[in-house]
Curated annotation (Swiss-Prot):
Keyword Flavoprotein listed: no
Name of the protein described by the UniProt record: DNA-binding protein S1FA2
Transmembrane region(s): none
Disulfide bridge positions per record: none
Superkingdom in the source lineage: Eukaryota
Motif (Nuclear localization signal): 50-55
Source organism (scientific name): Arabidopsis thaliana (Mouse-ear cress)
An example molecular function term from Gene Ontology annotations: DNA binding
Annotated Basic residues bias: 51-66
Encoding gene per record: S1FA2
Length: 76
């Protein structure tokens, strides 16, 4: 009797992969593909896009910075 039970388990295991494992492999594969694609696009952008321009400082901020440094602001 015990030999029949173990043979039945062997047949079930030989049927195929666990569906949960297949789902994990698919999700893992998609995640790895996504990360690799992001890295490739990042490297492409670093080579081909011009560097970002700094935002222009407003007159108010320029005045404040000059006051901090002790430089007299013209017009005052």
């Amino acid at each position: 009797m015990s030999s029949d039970g173990s043979a039945g388990k062997a047949v079930v295991e030989a049927k195929g992969l666990n569906p949960g494992l297949i789902v994990l492999l698919v999700i893992g594969g998609l995640l790895v593909t996504f990360l690799i694609a992001n890295y490739v696009m990042y490297m492409y952008a670093q080579k081909n896009l011009p560097p970002r321009k700094k935002k222009p400082l407003s007159k108010k901020k320029l005045k404040r910075e000059k006051l901090k440094q002790g430089v007299p602001v013209p017009g005052e």
